[in-house]
Regions:
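All-alpha prenyltransferase/terpene-synthase fold signal
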Residues: 1-139
Length: 139
């Protein structure tokens, strides 16, 4: 909306849209990682609550590539005792978290690239700090 109100061209509006979309995707992917690596206190909800609720996120899909048995646990909705713990171990012992981190970094880079057309200014510098802030939640 700010781009429209400030008279940006169609291509500039597209760049601003791509910035916001890719930044939002980076944020969501970081949130997906934290669901497996964060504490209940950090998250404000139980860790692994997305998986327990049946939400399949990037780490889960990546882990299923390495651990096909994970799909069966998810399909039966963790009905057996220990299913959720076993699923968590499959995700944590795989390359799912590092691969998802790479995905978040890609989205963050794409958000920065989307506003490369902007001339240097305090506003642009502030926007360019946002992807780094999103990624900083991982460390």
């Amino acid at each position: 909306a700010a781009g429209v109100l400030s008279g940006c061209s169609a291509s500039e509006l597209d760049g601003l849209y791509r910035f916001g979309r890719q930044l939002g995707l980076a944020f969501q992917v970081v949130d997906d990682i934290l669901d497996f690596t964060g504490s209940d206190q950090q998250l404000g909800k139980p860790a692994a609550s997305d998986l327990a609720s049946g939400y399949l996120t990037a780490p889960t899909f990546y882990a299923m590539e390495e651990h096909p048995g994970l799909q069966a646990l998810i399909a039966r909705e963790f009905a057996e005792p220990g299913d959720l713990d076993q699923a968590l171990e499959m995700v944590r012992s795989s390359r799912a978290i590092p691969r998802t981190r790479e995905l978040a970094e890609t989205f963050a880079r794409e958000s920065r690239d989307a506003i490369a057309w902007m001339s240097d200014s305090p506003c642009k510098r502030a926007l360019l700090e946002l992807p780094d802030f999103v990624l900083s939640r991982l460390y």
